[in-house]
Amino acid sequence: MCLILSIFTLIAFHIPFFRHVLSCLEGGFNGMIITTSLAVLMLALNYFFYYLLLYSGRFVGKCILAFTFIADAVSLYFINAYEVLITDKMMGNVFNTQYSEASGFFSMSAILYILFLGIIPCIYIFRRKVDYGTFRRFLSNVGISLAIAVSVALVNMKNWPWIDKNATELGSLLMPWSYTVNTVRYYSAEKKRNAKEILLPDARIATDSRDVCV
């Protein structure tokens, strides 16, 4: 189930991501390596995330997964319809926009996005019986997915400067990481911005004697 969901996530929600990747690459063998590596890395990390949620959360994990697919569908709609990037500033706009204002950005195509890319996967998630297996199997599957992710990262060490250069755009097109990570970043920035300044007490002379500072 987790592998199916990972493949579906890669294919259904990441066409804008790979379109941007290909537009930033010069092509050739190295470009093919980067593109393939990103696809494998996304499969491994999403598999790890889905498996961890389902095994540890059971029904609650299914609910969280269902929410992420609906959120993925909504995010993809805005990316395709309005060519936006899901950054921390974008998430700030989302949280500070009233429903009456936000409803004007939705159209009939948004309903289709949510239905086919959100609701139908949710039905599959809740109707599919999950074989959780043993804890040993859990550790094995989690370990394999992490090993694949680390291996891909190590193989592409020479390509990390390119990834770092395009990190903002790439991260804003990744599902479900774009809105989850940038939501945390937004609230973290808001917390720092709204933190009250702690004033120190007024300076005073502790003794009446005259001291000489050298």
Question: For each of these PLM feature ranges, what is it?
Answer:
Residues M1-L173:
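Transmembrane and membrane-interface helices of multi-pass
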Residues N156-V214:
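Membrane-interface segments at or immediately adjacent to transmembrane helices
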